[in-house]
Amino acid sequence: MALLDFILNLAALLLWLNWRLLALAPRESGPSGISLAGTIKSTAASRSPRWPYLSGLVGLLLVRSLAYHTIGSNLAERMTLPFGIVSISFNPRILKQMFLFSGLSFGLFLGAFYLWLLLFSIVNTRVTEPNACLRLLRLHLGWWERRPVWLKLLLPGVLGALAWLIAASLLEALALFPAQSSNTARGLRACLVGLYTYLCWVPPLASVLVLYMVNSYVYLGESAFWGFVQVTGRNLIEQFGLAKLRLRRLDFAPLLLLALVWFLQWRGHLGWFFGGARLLVEGWNRLR
């Protein structure tokens, strides 16, 4: 069920991006060639109706709620939604819980996607001549792309904390999450979720670093994607001050950054040596 939910979230995301892109593409003053398919013309975009994509998105979320209700009831399998630091279990036999699960699942998926875009925007904030991939990224961020870096860095933590405060109230009302003993505990949990939200940057960071290493030693062409990977990887290394960590043709900087990224998301420990995520989980478990 988790794989099915991921595939449907991906389909819903594509519908959302097409709906957004038809409104944003005419504003792009640069050359054409920035779309999900690779090219899109402003004149064509302005004439294309947007409502089918939004209607398809809403319909998909509603239909999959009914599908989860039917399939989950027959399999007697509970649906689990990873809410960052904690996982919430939903009963598929209760239809209203499946509607809530479907909406929250896509909301978290969409939020993580935009936080990935925000990360790449921060890393490449000094790039003055962006290629097609970076232009499209900046186009989707819209107003936030023009905000200062310090505000972009604060945004994931603030949004994660606020999202938990809102979701926790709803989950407690539906008895899907234990009621908190005090507002202080609720606020501390929100802060921990806010901090844990930054760990959603681990997958894109690790992916870019791995692809950067591959592209550094194997020629993979001159496509906009590989250009974006190369620029992003190089900017990451420079911003951490590791640009000179080389031995002849061997670049150790990506490996060092990968080790750091792995440590941040590690939930384990060796003696008194705790991974970054483990510290947040320990703090969460101590709250009542």
Where do the language-model regions lie?
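Selective transmembrane helix interface/packing segments
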Residues: 1-288
